[in-house]
A protein has these predicted regions:
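Serine-dependent carboxylesterase/thioesterase catalytic core
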Residues: 1-51, 65-68, 73
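C-terminal catalytic-base region of ester-bond hydrolases, centering on the histidine
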Residues: 47-130
Length: 130
């Protein structure tokens, strides 16, 4: 596998997961992925080029479980999707669940899989490229 695209993945760990993990009544939701979701991944050093598409429409239940300091998709903060060693990173206007239905996210994923980088964003804002 040469290229991988992650959609809204909290590669750097998840505040929502850390908050869920604090209580026995909700920690079970995280299952066997608890440690990874709470702590994040080590810097990427694998052979495949990895790109992340993050969302910036803050909708979803995650807003009830965490207060994000910066932009988020309502479940995962944009900052939580960044990880040293990524080949590229971009953001689109979508919620966490909306990323899988977003035409812009699909177009960006296709560009990364084809070219190894995300397409330039027409209206570049402070969070559009990393």
């Amino acid at each position: 596998m040469r290229r991988v695209v992650c959609l809204g993945s909290p590669l750097h760990g998840s505040l929502v997961a850390r908050n869920l993990g604090r209580h026995r009544a909700t920690a079970w939701v995280l299952g066997r992925s608890r440690a990874l979701l709470q702590g994040g991944c080590p810097p990427w050093q694998g052979q495949a080029r990895v790109g992340v598409v993050a969302g910036t429409v803050a909708r979803g239940a995650g807003r009830l479980l965490a207060r994000f300091d910066g932009p988020s998709d309502g479940t995962v903060a944009v900052a939580e999707t960044r990880l040293p060693g990524l080949a590229d990173h971009c953001v689109v206007a979508a919620s966490h669940t909306g990323l899988v239905f977003s035409r812009e996210a699909a177009d960006q994923a296709a560009a990364f899989l084809r070219d190894g980088r995300f397409a330039p964003v027409a209206a570049a804002g402070p969070y559009n490229r990393a």
